[in-house]
Regions:
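Interhelical loop and helix-boundary elements at the membrane-water interface
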Residues: 1-40, 51-160, 167-210
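Aromatic-rich transmembrane-lumenal/periplasmic boundary elements in polytopic membrane proteins
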Residues: 44-47
Length: 210
């Protein structure tokens, strides 16, 4: 969902990715609050987000309110017709992913996985759509976008490495950044807001275990 063929205008894509940066409060909260408290907050938040996506295809009133605020940032495929199938938007997937990694991983890995996604995905989208020229074989994503993802994901991961008590070191941080970049570029059907942080977190966990 980074630098594939445009579905929304470039300016809207930039605004959409800026929201990802604002969502960095979620991984920061994982580090500050710890695993049990973060999960206790993020799991209900994910349930609420899914419920709102359900409501916008079942209730005309809910649909009007939600689309008045967020429609300019939604991709066409995220706007099903009233009465149609429930489709989760990018923000909902982000909430689901945050809850999932908060439950699955220690706080340092969970925070790094989500921060890498939020910063890396935005960088891949902006760089890939503006300067991406070299496409991966059989895919729509660009090598330039993937490189931007890996570099910025590693950079934000360093902030987690530096966080006292995070338990994350340079090697796992690099592994998570590279794994996330490659998984983001791969044409896998599962939404990248979920598959990327989970597989990135698994890569970091595996490196820490070595």
């Amino acid at each position: 969902m980074s630098d594939a063929a445009p579905a929304i205008p470039y300016a809207a894509e930039v605004r959409r990715k800026a929201l990802h940066l604002g969502a960095l409060v979620l991984p920061a909260g994982m580090l500050i609050l710890g695993r049990p408290t973060a999960a206790l907050i993020l799991v209900p938040l994910a349930v609420l987000a899914v419920a709102l996506d359900w409501a916008r295809v079942r209730s005309a009133g809910a649909r009007r309110v939600l689309h008045a605020v967020f429609s300019s940032l939604m991709r066409p495929e995220e706007v099903p017709p009233l009465g149609g199938p429930v489709v989760l938007n990018g923000a909902t997937w982000m909430c689901v992913a945050s809850a999932l990694v908060a439950v699955l991983f220690p706080p340092g890995i969970a925070a790094a996985a989500m921060a890498m996604l939020m910063v890396g995905d935005g960088a891949a989208a902006v760089v890939g759509r503006r300067w991406g020229r070299t496409k991966w074989p059989g895919g729509l994503k660009s090598v330039e976008g993937t490189a931007a993802y890996a570099a910025t994901a590693f950079a934000v991961g360093l902030a987690v490495v530096a966080w006292p008590g995070s338990g994350l070191t340079l090697g796992p941080c690099a592994a998570g950044a590279v794994a996330g970049a490659l998984v983001e570029a791969a044409p896998i059907p599962l939404n990248d807001n979920v598959r990327v942080p989970v597989l990135s977190g698994l890569a970091m966990l595996a490196m820490l275990a070595l």
